[in-house]
């Protein structure tokens, strides 16, 4: 009997404190790999609870399958990606953004960033800044395609081990 394809729906919602350990592991594995682990569970939990931050998750919604025998790699409510942004009076800072490798190329990162940017606009923020590894050409390209520009080169930014670019996007029209 042939296996039918799955239908996967994604919903965005605020991160739950109970998800902090998983988000921290995602940060370690997909953002901080090769560096000292900075964004551990306690730090993520703090950002989730911080009134000046938004921690957003992309989760799977109810999965519909035509063939009940088919194995699926996702369960309802699985976290597939997350983004965390802090908000100041004029500037927001994208702290972390990651999507599980098996869930990439589904516009999850774009949807997370759209939501966080809209929240920044609603809050009256005029600019978003972020840092990205200098060697992460895929992420740098993603952000450039989204209207961010490389503002500063930060030599040794990551614990003296790796350099970064500070990128920024102006939200107000000139």
Regions found by a protein language model. Name each.
Residues 2-8, 14-104, 110-119, 123, ...:
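Acetyl-CoA-dependent GNAT
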Residues 3-8, 55-57, 126-129, 133-140, ...:
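C-terminal "cap" of GNAT-fold acetyltransferases
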Residues 29, 73, 86, 142, ...:
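Intrinsically disordered, low-complexity N-terminal regions enriched in serine/proline/glycine
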Residues 43-45, 152-155:
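Short, P/G- and charge-enriched loop/turn segments at secondary-structure junctions
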Residues 79, 150-153:
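Residue-level detector of beta-propeller blades
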Residues 100-114, 121-123, 127, 133-141, ...:
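Conserved glycine-rich acetyl-CoA-binding loop
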